[in-house]
Amino acid sequence: ISLIRHPNVGGILAVGLGCEYIQPEWLSNIAKEEEKESAWLFIQNEGGTRTAINKGVEEVQRILKKLKQTPRVEMGFDDLVIGAECGGSDYTSGLAGNVVVGRFFDKLVDMGGTAIFEEIVEAIGLVDLLTKRAVDQKAKEEIQYTYDKALEYCKAVRQYSVSPGNFAGGLSTIEEKSMGAVVKSGSRP
């Protein structure tokens, strides 16, 4: 639902089989309440996958046609807020992909934009790297509090956000994964 309400989403096509708890019509109605273009369909009601795909393409083309009529509004970098989400960590994450995201975040912040790094659970062992970048004492305390809360949770459930897939991808410890994740946050306050 939050994705439907996201300002960068102009319209949606909600697709279902008919047996889901969250029904596509309901999602479509939420989009309409947000004054966004929307359509929905059930694959089974359309007569199968091929027919549903064709119907979906028609609906998306209709939505795009209306979206193209939307007036463009200029904005500055100071209006831009971008967040990074985990993309699956392996041994290359801290060497390549996440480094690029971190450099992008630095440039975004330098131009007045806002970058959000939300993976505090994946920063286990590296809180000092984050707190030293805080813009003030209050921010430093908030980072420390959030980190401590995440660490307490990890200890309680005995799970430190490292998965079998991470190990299969070449990572060996949560600290190694954390280094790859934190580099994604860039280096700016």
Predicted feature locations:
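Metallocofactor- and cofactor-centric catalytic cores in central/energy metabolism, strongly enriched
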Residues: I1-P189
